[in-house]
Amino acid sequence: MTMTITPTITRESLLSLEAYSKYRKENKPAIMAHRKLRSVRLGENLNLQFESETTLRYQIQEMLRIEKVFEEEGIQQELDAYVPLLPTGHNWKGTLLLEYPDVNERKRELSRLIGIEDRMFIEVEGHARVYAIADEDLERENDEKTSAVHFVRFELNAAMRAAVKAGAGVKLGCDHTNYPAHTSMAPETLASLAGDLI
């Protein structure tokens, strides 16, 4: 059983719940490895999951499976939620997770990290920083705290895309006052992300 891979995700390209159950058993380890490859930790508490057709298709199919959704309207709602996170060839899109297992610490840190999503950046070797465009779908913070989940997009110009495809190094960073951090992306992660770019 194979899943149809398309440039976008449509209702017609999704598997039925029964077909997905079989597909999932055979392919979950490979999908989890792909997700891990495209996940970049920044410090102890930030994790950026760079999305792809594979990660988003998996997320949609999992939501449909868990919620036992098979009606057209419910399927369309999941598509409307996740398809905008597909990279378009000129950008990288991701889900930023602020991970604090302790409830009290999470509450405290989310209040200290208001605006963190706008301070996330990537820096392609030899090029200026590109800051994230965050939460285009809705407001995810208020005056008291930020959300533990943000959706971010990094737009890369043609020179940056060419540099990444040619093997340039890339840093992921954050220059929020209360969470300054940066890391160099692993070559295997960059190889996967380079495949998103045209």
Language-model regions, residue ranges each:
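Long, contiguous binding/interaction regions
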Residues: 2-91, 99-198
